[in-house]
C-alpha cells in the first residue's frame, strides 16, 4: 500500500485514517482492541483522536478514547507501527489554546496514550482570545522537547490559517503542517478556500465527517431509520432533498463498481488532489473491512465526475 506524506515535514500515512472517537463510546475496550488489531494488520497506520473524545456520550467525561488507545499500545507494543494524532482545545476540562493549557493538556494526553510523543498534535478549535504567537510558541516548545513531532490545525477557517502560517514564518516558529476540516460528498465547503491554502503551502489534509456521520454509508434511507441511534443528532440534517438525491447517485455508482456506498464515498475523497487521507470510523470488524476496502477501489473517471456533480448539487 502506497503511503502519503502529511505536508512537507509530517509522517507518511496510509490513505485512510481511523477515527478514534468511537473508542470507549460506541466501541468498548475489547471491541476497540480488535478493531485496532485489524487496522494495523491490514497495513494502515494513522489513528486520530482527541482529549475531548467522547465526553458527549452518556456517562462519559472525555479522555476515554486516548485511554483505550494507550491501553492497546501498552498491550500490543505497536507504538512504532502507528501514527498517533490527537488534539487540544475543545474539552471543557482543558479548554482553549493558551500556553499554560497546551502545556498541561499535552502531558495529560501523553499519560493517557501511554507514550512519550505525539506524532501530530492539533489545535482542535481556533481560539481568537489567545494571540497566535502564544499558541504557536507553546506548540513549538513541545516540538523542541520531543513531545510532539508535527503540528496541525482543526476547524480553522482559511483566514485564520493564513494568519497562523504568517506568524510562524515571521517569528521563526513551527507551522501548522496538517489541517483537519470537515469534508465529504455532501459538505464541500473545504473546496471554497481552504483547499487552495493547503495546496499553496503544501499542507497535509485529513478530513473528518468523511462519511457524513454514516449518512454516506447508505444504510439509513430516511429520518425514521435514525431513531435510537447514537448518531441521530449528527445525521438528521442530511436528510433533505439534496442529500437524498446524492444518495441515489452514490448507490448507483456503488452498484456499477461492485462496491459499497461507503467505499465509493471514501474512494472519491481519496481521489481529491488537496486531500491526503480521509478519517473514518467503525464499530465492528465488518464495518472496518468495508471502509478499508476503499483504498483498493479505483473509480472510473465517469464515476468520479458523476459523484462530483452530485456532490456539488448538494452543496
In which residue ranges do the predicted regions lie?
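Beta/alpha (TIM)-barrel catalytic core signal, keyed to glycine-rich beta->alpha loops juxtaposed to Asp/Glu
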Residues: 126-315
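N-terminal binding-site loop/beta-alpha segment at the start of enzyme catalytic domains
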Residues: 1-80
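Active-site mouth loops of central-metabolism enzymes
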Residues: 20-30, 88-100, 129
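Acidic (Asp/Glu)-rich catalytic clusters
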Residues: 8, 41, 70-81, 110-114, ...
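Short, acidic/polar
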Residues: 28-39, 97-112, 161-166
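Residues at the N-termini of beta-strands
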Residues: 15, 46, 117-120, 150, ...
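Active-site groove signature of glycoside hydrolases
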Residues: 110-129
